[in-house]
């Protein structure tokens, strides 16, 4: 089997309608991507699977859809206006700007220290490290650097007809703050007792200087976040619970265990508000990358908004007659990143008996863009085969493919990850049965048309 690389994944994604470069007819816009017909189905299935397990089937959690634009005081209280910065450094010869921490990490990873993290270093420490190690610009090959400066990652815009500081607002850099400011609304309206969680799926925006690796790091991205509120003193137990819950979700949807690892943050790596954080990392073709962060945020966010707004977010525990501000566990997952992980994990080039080969995307059926494809053996059979399509498409995403030979159609469906091909042949007119081919095993079984829906229902469960 050929080794996976990002170029192969990106090419397949474009060729088969998963992901296209953004604004391509105008030369594109750096690091923007549009999800094509199959990509939007895949990503929607990922979001649906997350919502199913984290909200629909959870007795603890409820959902929210907060506005992207928020009162700027939100970002003052959360610390994003003052602290949401990247350390930037420019090479004077190439005129290219880099994140200083990423320059250092890339250098150390190349030296063999795969787990080196520069998060805890001050600007002075990073500059001293770059100078002492003689780290050079990848483009110019020189070490002619500027001093390190802060660069705020928030996208700024204006509300109303005039562009003045009084009308200044921001595109949200995370979905979490919309949850925190609605904590009391949700808790009271839904009559929730601790522990409980508020989940949200939505777009966020960060003016990253060094985005890259396809849809792994982009300036516009989608998050699937849960803020889980609990009694202080129980947060480590719940952080462990959600860490394991998240890892199981990935495994149940087919992510290979050898391609994931759980990494606990060292004490000097923790954010100032966190007392425990675990990253679930995935082994992408370009290396290990963070997929999911599960952080114990303590009571930092609720207290910050209490102080800034004057509202009281404390909780009265009727069982113990205590009053306290809840602690919060945040499992935060990037929808685009995990979609990329599913693309990479599913991709396989398989050599078959007789020397033939095929490309197959082994998506879990719950995630596959199409659950099945209806393939009439002859175009003469298309009207009758279409009746099967119409019956199934009320409940499933189904493809209808009548062009080229049956073998080429099988290969095409394998390459887009369709789990089952349903062939309607001339015998189907007489016996009301179809042939169902399994994508992974390529085995075929004859089945009554009346049983196909129940068959697909069972197969897409996870």
UniProtKB/Swiss-Prot annotation:
Enzyme Commission number: 6.1.1.14
InterPro entries noted in UniProt: aa-tRNA-synt_IIb, aa-tRNA-synth_II, aa-tRNA-synth_II/BPL/LPL, Anticodon-bd, Anticodon-bd_dom_sf, Gly-tRNA_synthase/POLG2, Gly_tRNA_ligase_bac, GlyRS-like_core
GO biological process, one term: glycyl-tRNA aminoacylation
UniProt entry tagged with the keyword Ribosomal protein: no
Classification via Gene3D superfamilies: 3.30.40.230, Anticodon-binding domain, Bira Bifunctional Protein, Domain 2
Location in or out of the cell: Cytoplasm
Binding site for substrate: 99, 174, 221-225, 330-334
GO MF term set: ATP binding; catalytic activity, acting on a protein; glycine-tRNA ligase activity; protein dimerization activity; transferase activity
Subunit structure: Homodimer.
PANTHER family listed in its UniProt record: DNA POLYMERASE SUBUNIT GAMMA-2, MITOCHONDRIAL (PTHR10745:SF8), GLYCYL-TRNA SYNTHETASE/DNA POLYMERASE SUBUNIT GAMMA-2 (PTHR10745)
Protein name, UniProt field: Glycine--tRNA ligase
Species lineage: Bacteria, Bacillati, Bacillota, Bacilli, Bacillales
